[in-house]
Amino acid sequence: MKTYERFLNYVRIHTASSEDSSSVPTTERQFDLAKLLVKELHAIGVENARVDDKCYVYASVAATPGCENCPAIGFIAHMDTVPDFSGENVQPRIIENYDGGDVVLGTSGRVLSPKKLPHLPSLKGKTLIVTDGTTVLGGDDKAGIAEIMTAIERVISENRPHGKLCIGFTPDEEVGSGADNFNVAEFGADFAYTVDGGAEGEIEYENFNAAAAKIVVNGFNIHPGDSKNKMINALLVAMELNSMLPDETPANTEGYEGFFHLTDMSGNVERAEMDYIIRDHSEAIMTARKATLAHAVKILNEKYGSGTVECTVRDQYLNMVEKIRPCMHLIDNAVEAAKSIGLVPKVAPIRGGTDGARLSFMGLPCPNLGTGDFACHGPYEHVTVEGMEKCTELVLLLIDKYSKAAK
């Protein structure tokens, strides 16, 4: 089966995770894809494929004769889609020989346009897969799953020599808990790659340090006509707090620049809540960002009274760069493999995180590879058939390279 054919099957399975669930996985529907993947792995000859009670899929292919002393290499992707935009009833549309211009997305009123996404003309002539404008496409990360599955099928059917190969598919990556219950020992790899990036040719081993902040503002409500020097409007205090933070938002930053991102805000005069994510590649600057937020809270409590603003900060993940630097062969081999299939390698920091960032600190060095997916997490998400084929080839070449390496 071709990569894009698998992909089209996978995206039709609703697998969105949930921020509001404490169960593992956060949504039972993720098992629907997990069970299908196990069935497909069995069908291509990976008889030990299994899914555990927490919805983690594990499988391995034993080394071929003569490659038993090669490193065990793993490939990992996640099954869930983002909960922030619908992933239900995905209706992918294939556009052959894309002209590089506007694409009307079904009857949604949305248009995929180079005016908003200037990379689109570079995809001219390729076969584009888009949404109908009402859902995500699910390329994040079902493109990665399809690429891994196709590569493993080809390794087996073409009798390519290889060291031990380890395959893992995780739940709940989009809500930050994809690595929480990942069993590194059971997975069995010496090194791994997540296949969860953007454009084909992306190779990433630096990611944000990440934290989440929960702000609760406790106001004092009284009749507006009798509120002089008495009322504390929680909504206005919340707005004041936001105004005290640097103007370093996702829309104003790029590359190695970090940010404060207000993701949710709700409330009334009596009580308001705000959710922030805080990101930076530098651990020192990340510490300073937390201090900036704490200082703003302190100033507001001095102004409006102790306990007016409550702030809880929770660390989420760390920059994996320190764990990858001793294993730079992972990056060097990926760069060489990309060049050999005509891709221009783009080694750049991830403005986000992956399961691999967490796994790297759990003893499994795990940089990230592109999947050919663009504009993820919303209705403008799209991939190209050609891009996914290149990403599949990249996985195959990495398997080939490590079949010639010794531990």
Positions of PLM-derived features:
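Flexible, glycine/charged-enriched surface loops at secondary-structure junctions
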Residues: 19-20, 48, 161-164, 247-261, ...
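His/Asp/Glu-rich mid-to-C-terminal helical/loop segments that flank catalytic regions of hydrolases
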Residues: 157, 232-249, 284-298, 332, ...
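N-terminal capping segment at the start of a domain
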Residues: 2-28, 130, 317, 374-378
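Midchain, well-structured core segments that form catalytic/ion-binding scaffolds
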Residues: 103, 117-120, 126-139, 171-299, ...
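Active-site metal-coordination/substrate-binding segment of hydrolases
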Residues: 67-164, 189
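Active-site-adjacent substrate-binding region
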Residues: 236-252, 259-261, 308, 318-366
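Short pre-catalytic strand/loop immediately N-terminal to key active-site residues, enriched for Gly-Thr
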Residues: 130-138, 344-348, 378-379
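A non-catalytic alpha/beta surface segment that caps or lines the substrate-entry region
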Residues: 22-70, 74-76, 80, 90
